[in-house]
Amino acid sequence: KGASYESGLDNTPMYDGVEFDTTKNLLKIQDVGLTGLYVMDCEALAYMARELGQEDAYQELAGRAEKYKKAMQALWDDNFGLFLNRHTDGKQLSKRISPTNFYALNAKAATQEQAERMMKEHFYNPEEFWGDYIMPSIARNDTAYTAETYWRGSIWAPMNLLVYWGMQNYELPQAKDDLSEKSKDLLLKNWLEKGWVRENYHAETGSYNKRSEHFYHWGALLGMIYLVENG
């Protein structure tokens, strides 16, 4: 449980039943989202290192980013049309999916064709992430989905922002526009009805959620997506 909390996703169903390696103190899973963020982090640090004239640090960080970006292709399931987490004990890919599966786009690990499939088959799939309010923190057709139980369905602004940032790396104009519009609408719905900028949002009603602070700084990221998209 503690290891899953270190992901920042607390009670996400993605890690339910995943074995814990007591030797390495790690969950036995290769995670698309965390790997995508690691690559993104390495690229940002590499840029900073080059600007500061630290060429050795730049080479190391850029090399790490490229290594793991290429390795992420092993997590692509061509039948399913998405990058999937992989259990390291049996090597099987996990079909429990969340917005973090889109973070392969943040690492630029996907081809344009793969990115388009991810949008068509999953982002716009009403059984998974599409709907009046998006994006739920676990696919709507997951057995653990409840729409309002923290990371088991609730909508979180940082997830929307990270998916949007990933989309920016590809030619996905309609998906970017749709995500920005729905994010803005979700923010304004709560602000106009209650004057709230919430920690997270109910994935079916778009409003009240028992496990959510009424005011939380990252809720405003929903509006930031719209402002960036409309420049």
Indicate where each model-derived feature is located.
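Short amphipathic alpha-helical coiled-coil/interface segments
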Residues: 58-76, 180-183
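Extracellular S/T/G-rich loop segment that most often corresponds to the catalytic His/Ser-adjacent loop
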Residues: 128-130
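Conserved hydrophobic/aromatic pocket- or pore-lining residues that grip, position, or stack substrates
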Residues: 38, 65, 104
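Generic detection of long, well-ordered alpha-helical segments
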Residues: 35, 55-58, 62, 113, ...
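The feature captures the catalytic groove of carbohydrate-active enzymes
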Residues: 1-59, 90, 138-162, 168-169, ...
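C-terminal capping/lid segments that line or modulate ligand- or cofactor-binding pockets
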Residues: 77-126, 143, 148-231
